[in-house]
């Protein structure tokens, strides 16, 4: 942008740079690129490609995953671990319920044929990432626990459909909790004499949809050509990592293409870094793109 400002070339197209504030913000609404888009300040960019510079490895990233954060809260009955037949062990219930949910998820949302076209490294996944319980003695079966995790969803499935389906899984498991696998001869999730049943509830935090870039657009073609010229090869890829906001921009009519010049191997590392040589190539790629858009 500095070079363009200094030389002031006569261009057929307008080059606009947006420096994003709080790109991964989730706690403060109304700032950053979402607010800029809402106020219509990006509307002119609908007439040309929009390049989102936030991926890595100098290659076009043509697909990203949606994300559904979930929490599974499990209730049982607290009791001494020496008398497990008088308890409902929420840890065992959580493990078996989650296993059942995962089995159903992978049956209902299998690898999609378009994932091969886009080169996704993984299909959609549903897995735990955190486990917590209130605490207590080692000889105490707790009354409750919670498992948290996420769904990473390729953009060929609908976020709303998945949330609805996960809730249906949980409702069905609760209704038929006696049919769930147990852990050993005295493990159980119902205490008929006490009229007690274990139970699970699922809740969701804010979900985001994934993106499949338009592979027929001019923006994609000029990016690929520029990458091949500068880097020496072009190999688009897709991951189920999530990029915020770009699906919203795509739905509003923008030709969103994503690329980046950091290193995927250092994503979220303690000492995350990039290479100046890669950034220089990024400069050359976009100089080539600007030239191509003049044709």
Locate the predicted segments by residue.
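Acidic/histidine-rich catalytic neighborhood of metal-dependent amide-processing enzymes
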Residues: 1-65, 294
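Metal-dependent amide/peptide-bond hydrolase catalytic core
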Residues: 60-62, 69-295
């Amino acid at each position: 942008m500095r070079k363009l400002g200094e030389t002031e070339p006569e261009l057929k197209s307008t080059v606009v740079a947006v420096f994003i504030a709080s790109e991964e913000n989730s706690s403060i609404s109304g700032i950053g690129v979402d607010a800029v888009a809402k106020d219509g300040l990006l509307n002119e960019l609908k007439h040309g490609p929009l390049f989102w510079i936030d991926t890595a490895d100098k290659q076009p990233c043509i697909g990203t995953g949606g994300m559904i954060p979930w929490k599974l809260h499990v209730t049982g009955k607290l009791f001494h671990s020496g008398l497990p037949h008088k308890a409902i062990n929420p840890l065992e219930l959580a493990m078996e319920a989650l296993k059942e949910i995962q089995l159903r998820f992978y049956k209902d949302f299998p690898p999609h044929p378009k994932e091969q076209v886009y080169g996704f490294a993984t299909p959609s996944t549903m897995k735990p990432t955190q486990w917590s319980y209130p605490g207590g003695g080692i000889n105490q079966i707790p009354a409750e626990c919670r498992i948290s995790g996420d769904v990473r969803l390729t953009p060929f499935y609908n976020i709303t459909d998945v949330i609805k389906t996960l809730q249906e899984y949980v409702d069905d498991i609760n209704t038929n909790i006696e049919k769930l696998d147990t852990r050993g001869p005295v493990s159980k999730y119902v205490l008929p004499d006490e009229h007690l049943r274990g139970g699970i509830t699922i809740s969701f935090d804010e979900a985001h949809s994934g993106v499949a870039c338009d592979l027929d657009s001019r923006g994609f073609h000029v990016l690929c050509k520029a990458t091949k010229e500068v880097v020496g090869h072009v190999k688009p890829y897709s991951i189920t990592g999530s990029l915020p906001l770009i699906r919203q921009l795509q739905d509003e009519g923008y030709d969103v293409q994503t690329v980046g010049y950091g290193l995927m191997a250092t994503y979220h590392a303690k000492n995350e870094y990039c290479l100046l040589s890669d950034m220089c190539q990024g400069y050359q790629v976009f100089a080539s793109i600007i030239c191509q858009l003049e044709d």
